[in-house]
Amino acid sequence: MSAAVQPLQIKILDPRLGTVWLLPTYATEASAGLDLRAALDAPMTLVPGDAELLSTGVAIHLVDPSLCAVVLPRSGLGHRHGIVLGNGTGLIDSDYQGPLLVSVWNRGREAFTIEPGDRIAQLVVLPIVRVVLQVVDTFVESGRGAGGFGHTGVR
């Protein structure tokens, strides 16, 4: 079974995308995220603790207000090299039309060099549900109740 496909408007801001480097693309048929590349002019070394804002060379417009996009880290970069997103997750609203920028942070112990065109993050498009707040005095009791962090244990 294949996933639903919808068009996504994209502006190419760096002419190397689609010529020297691939446009944002799904790595496999079942990938959830489009790989985003570092639109750098030269290699950039992140020493431990450094964070930089990198261009992906594209802008998107989701158009449909029932959609949003999230910029997520690439698992291998975080696990192997300590390179994660500086803001955890980037949320792209449907009405945003500016350049996609990625905050990369080296939380590792060694310097890491990002080369021009390297895949640095992934973009996942998600449906959203907008809510209307309903103020109440009490909640109908649930099985969990107000049990918070760690209340279910690890086993």
Swiss-Prot record:
Pathway the protein acts in: Pyrimidine metabolism; dUMP biosynthesis; dUMP from dCTP (dUTP route): step 2/2
Keyword Metal-binding: yes
Catalytic activity, as annotated: dUTP + H2O = dUMP + diphosphate + H(+)
Cofactor: Mg(2+)
Molecular function terms, GO-annotated: dUTP diphosphatase activity; magnesium ion binding
Pfam families: dUTPase
Annotated positions binding substrate: 74-76, 87, 91-93
Tree of life domain: Bacteria
One Gene Ontology term from the biological process aspect of the record: dUMP biosynthetic process
Record has Transmembrane helix as a keyword: no
EC number: 3.6.1.23
Gene3D superfamilies: 2.70.40.10
CDD domains: trimeric_dUTPase (cd07557)
Keywords assigned: Hydrolase, Magnesium, Metal-binding, Nucleotide metabolism
Protein family membership: Belongs to the dUTPase family.
Cited function: This enzyme is involved in nucleotide metabolism: it produces dUMP, the immediate precursor of thymidine nucleotides and it decreases the intracellular concentration of dUTP so that uracil cannot be incorporated into DNA.
Identification of the protein by name: Deoxyuridine 5'-triphosphate nucleotidohydrolase
